[in-house]
Amino acid sequence: MANPVAGIAGSAAKSVRPFRSSEAYVEAMKEDLADWLNALYSLGLPGSGDGFLTGLATGTTLCQHANAVTEAARALAAARPTRGVAFQAHSVAPGSFMARDNVASFIGWCRAELGVPEVLMFETEDLVLRKNEKSVVLCLLEVARRGARLGLLAPRLVQFEQEIERELRATPQVSSVPAAEEDVTEIATVPGVPTRTPRMTPNDLRNLDELVREILGRCTCPDQFPMIKVSEGKYRVGDSSLLIFVRVLRSHVMVRVGGGWDTLEHYLDKHDPCRCSSSTHRLPQQRTGTFSPQRGSPTPSPRPGSPVPGSERRSSRPEVTPISLRGTKEGPETPLRPRDQLPPLPRSRRYSGDSDSSASSAQSGPMGARSDDSATGSRRERPSHRPTSCLPASPRRPTAPRSQSRDRLDRGRPRVAPGGRGAQLSTSSPARRTRSQSREEQAVLMVRRDRDGQHSWVARGRGGGGSGGSGRSTPQTPRALSPAAPRPSRGPSPGPELAATPASIFRTPLQLDPQQEQQLFRRLEEEFLANARALEAAASHTPMGSAPDPPAPDSAYCSSSSSSSSLSVLGGKCGQPGESGRTANGLPGPRSQALSSSSDEGSPYLAVGGALDATRSSLAGPEPSLTWARGRMDTQPDRKPSRIPTPRGPRRPSGPIELGAWHAQHSVTPRTEPDSSM
């Protein structure tokens, strides 16, 4: 198993040094300086690795060479240097205080006597602790150049510089050489000093051209970086007229760059656009022969401005994945169904007697189903890479705003609910698959209201006691049923039985002619005005006295579920205990008819005891004038009431009272009592 720490260290080294060839020229310079010092002082310094800096860490060799340069300057009567270096030569350990003192003395001599530029200087720690070997190498090369002017033996790189200088002086067209290179090549030499420039053999030049072609051949691009040979060791690179001088130093191909040297590999890595953009050239590569796409050679990377042949054809043609491959990658695709074919979701409708909690639960069902459908719709629309042969989804139709009057008219209509959730979404089992295929078959529920204000439902086509249950809840649908509750069987809808069902169960609005409807509205207005006048007349004869405060209702009576029951008590139900009215003087009086605010808005029918009250009031005589009447707010007779009003005898009316428009309406459309079986 690979060491993770080593992997991290390797990646860090790659991030710090993006080019492996950037350190090659430092190694080449170290080898050249080691040969130079070994030839001068017979030291035996290794040229590779850390052995070169380790041999110079005591500072003894550096101070010895400084004194040699000073003696050569004195012999030639040169102006500089004038003073040597005093140092400790015996029993000096690397890294000790004396070693640091020797290195510091050499650095001071370079600054003061030779005038080495500060950019080429190094610090004591750079040599003793081997922190910055590049600065040490560059400083030693500059010291070697200054010593070569005084007649001392120079390293091979300095000899190459002197040779290039003579070649440039012999060339008549000096303008072709860059100005920066001219400044570097102009090296002042002391007159009378013999030059020790080694001669390059023809074998070296022949090997140089072969090595250059080999390095250029490592790039596998069709259009390689141009490097044209002008003369022996002189090349023109790129599209410009820039000339570079190339020399061979041991196993390295060196290029004269500005005032220093660089390897040809590193130079091409920085100037060749193909090598700069490709990461494959940043690692050491083996030499490859003829280019063959079948061999395991590095992948050719196209240069900017020179596209690979055939790339136009590949780029102009869009990449299209075959449908068969997509099916294998993405799995089997299920045919999508347009959203218009999905059955509409049922709207939640609040009936009279329903509490707020039941209404919210009724809304949570369809809303949850709608969110599921929207989620599935978004999943259907998410993959944009579907084949065009699939059935496109039709655009969504905007939902029209629904007003309150429309909702009130829809309250009296029979509620239609689609199939259950399992029939809409799941198609795993055969029963659910059959149910989803018959999605258009819709169940009709018949909802009725009992005398105590409770609702019960039965499925259409069921006889007898088919009520699914009663309670203060919303009319149950197959979606709202719990798993434990039995589902009503979806049988064939019998036509005669549906026709024989009383209209009060469906609570459909009465179909009247426009003339009868206007006449009914006119009677209602007249009755309303008459009642208002009677209330004003009764209020004028009210004795001076404050009416007793009503008792504080219990929290169980504050919910909207008891509002309809309270209205039904005020509307007049027979046989219920504690339903006697209360007047200002404590006498019980007949109950006034109350209009239902929720359940009877869309239906012209009255409560169950409406017709009986009309008959009783006509037999008993005219109604007494009511000053202040308030019904008992108690819908639970089994519990002990908090306050029971004192019953008193009714007053005898002074004159007969005529029937109102509501009684006339019952004469037009008599109410049909629901079946006892329901």
Swiss-Prot record:
Biased composition (Pro residues): 485-495
One GO cellular component term noted in the UniProt record for this chain: stress fiber
Ranges of compositional bias, category Low complexity: 354-365, 392-403, 509-519, 554-568
Biased composition (Gly residues): 461-471
Function: Seems to be involved in the cross-linking of microtubules and microfilaments. Regulates microtubule dynamics and stability by interacting with microtubule plus-end tracking proteins, such as MAPRE1, to regulate microtubule growth along actin stress fibers.
Positions carrying Phosphoserine: S306, S316, S352, S355, S394, S436, S438, S482, S489, S493, S654
Upper lineage: Eukaryota, Metazoa, Chordata, Craniata, Vertebrata
UniProt region (Disordered), positions on chain: 276-524, 538-678
Biological processes, Gene Ontology terms: cellular response to starvation; microtubule bundle formation; negative regulation of microtubule depolymerization
Keywords, alphabetical: Acetylation, Cytoplasm, Cytoskeleton, Methylation, Phosphoprotein
Quaternary structure note: Interacts with MAPRE1.
KW Magnesium (keyword) present: no
Name of this protein: GAS2-like protein 1
Similarity section: Belongs to the GAS2 family.
Modified residues (Phosphothreonine): T334, T501
Occurrences of domain GAR (ranges): 203-275
Chief localization: cytoplasm
InterPro entries: CH_dom (IPR001715), CH_dom_sf (IPR036872), GAR_dom (IPR003108), GAR_dom_sf (IPR036534)
Pfam families with a match to the protein in the record: CH, GAS2
Start-end of Basic and acidic residues biased regions: 327-340, 370-381, 404-413, 437-454, 631-641
Family matches, as SMART domains: CH, GAS2
Subcellular location: Cytoplasm, Cytoskeleton; Cytoplasm, Cytoskeleton, Stress fiber
